[in-house]
Amino acid sequence: MASKGKPKPKPRPRGGAFRGIADAGFRKFQSREALGMYIDNPSAYMGTRQLGSTPANADSALTVAGQVICYDDHFVSIHDKFPKASVHALLLPRDPDVYKEHPIVLLSRRDEAGEAFRQAVCVEAEKLRTILAGELQRRFGQFSAADAAREAVLRGDAELDGELPAGRDWSKEVIMGVHARPSMNHVHVHVFSRDMHSEKMRHRKHYNSFTTPFLVQLDEFPLAPDDPRQPFAVRTQGGLSSETADDAGDNRDMKCWRCGRNFGNRFQELKRHLDVEFEAWKKE
């Protein structure tokens, strides 16, 4: 009687090269360290499609969550893996001397090196903002009243008289900032559209973390040492003010970013309202 051998292991499904590298990177940099894989080896996460190429479907390169947009020796720009708006990217410094510092402390430094770093971050964030603004115009310009003349020329419905009309300034719809209490260990700047329209925005904390003082915008830096959004060790006075968001706004009322309507803790009602506001915002 033949003896039974050990069952053969089931073959693992074969993914693409990007998937394999990404999985390996995620195993090395897990949880709060996950952004480290982009800093460590950004070329592994570029994917197969580059900016400016023609997408195979309605999604463009800027909608590929978790992929790198661009990088150099000093910074990496990536698509947020869990975008909370129509376009949402992260800017990651690559300098190991600073990338584990608290972003509020780092961007509030007033010494020469701190000023130089903050200026470099602002320059790179503006570049990323321009990229995202272009993506907003590409996606939503056809709906915008301010882009009507430009879109008519692009469609061939109007003659081009001189230069192509600039149309809507979509860069004004893009916000840049860092969280007062970041969820990831590596310094990362959020660069995102203000519409807050995404299936990945699933609860109150998500919404309030981007629409309250918990998000410190880049043009607010440097913060004063006693600003309540500073880490406790840095502050020179008392505890957190009720006007800040140490808990990412878990207990704050949710207010529409566009009209200011207060939804209290009624998240699903807010989501339905944001769908309506999104359509109106596109048409401005």
Language-model features, listed with the residues they occupy:
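Active-site microenvironments that recognize anionic phosphate/pyrophosphate groups
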Residues: M1-S108, E112, R229-E284
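Intrinsically disordered, low-complexity regions enriched in proline, serine, glycine
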Residues: D80, H88, K100-P103, Q137-A145, ...
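Short histidine-centered catalytic/ligand-binding loop motif
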Residues: L90-S144
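Aromatic/acidic cage segments in peptide-binding pockets
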Residues: L92-D97, V105-E115, F192-D219
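Histidine-centered divalent-metal-coordination microenvironment in nucleic-acid enzymes
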Residues: P93, I175-M196
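Intrinsically disordered, low-complexity domain-flanking/linker segments in eukaryotic proteins
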Residues: L107, G134-D169
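Long, charged, low-complexity intrinsically disordered regions
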Residues: I131, G141-E151, S209-T236, L240, ...
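Conserved, structured regulatory domains from eukaryotic proteins
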Residues: V153-G167, E173-I175, H186, F192, ...
